[in-house]
Amino acid sequence: MFTVIFGRPGCPYCVRAKELAEKLSKERDDFNYRYIDIHAEGITKADLEKTVGKPVETVPQIFVDQKHIGGCTDFEAWAKENLNLFA
């Protein structure tokens, strides 16, 4: 599975999501991720809204296999439910 994390510098939830993705990529052969710095890439929240299909107020915004998962807390819950993380 391939995960994309859209985040920004200085965001503690972005750091937390990236750390979780890094942990998963080391523990699982089937998990890869890419972190995209929205400021460095010139991506706005309005751009993300077009992909997500609803208003985006916060980052990170996380997608797994092109399916929108949500923010950091949503990603942690998804990992727990789908990858038996923290079990």
From Swiss-Prot:
Q: Which SUPFAM superfamilies match?
A: Thioredoxin-like
Q: Which residues form a coiled coil?
A: none
Query: Which BP terms does GO give this entry?
Result: cell redox homeostasis; cellular response to oxidative stress; deoxyribonucleotide biosynthetic process
Q: What GO molecular functions are on record for this protein?
A: electron transfer activity; glutathione disulfide oxidoreductase activity; protein-disulfide reductase activity
What are the UniProt keywords, alphabetically? Deoxyribonucleotide synthesis, Disulfide bond, Electron transport, Redox-active center, Transport
Does NAD count among this protein's keywords? Answer: no
In terms of superkingdom, the source organism counts as: Bacteria
Cellular compartments per GO CC: cytoplasm
The SS bond pairs are: 11-14
Q: Which residues form the Glutaredoxin domain?
A: 1-87
Query: Pfam families in the record, alphabetically?
Result: Glutaredoxin
PANTHER family per the UniProt record, alphabetical:
GLUTAREDOXIN 1, GLUTAREDOXIN 2
Q: How does it assemble?
A: Monomer.
Role of this protein: The disulfide bond functions as an electron carrier in the glutathione-dependent synthesis of deoxyribonucleotides by the enzyme ribonucleotide reductase. In addition, it is also involved in reducing some disulfides in a coupled system with glutathione reductase.
Instruction: Report what the protein is called.
Output: Glutaredoxin 1
- Tell me which species this is from: Salmonella typhimurium (strain LT2 / SGSC1412 / ATCC 700720)
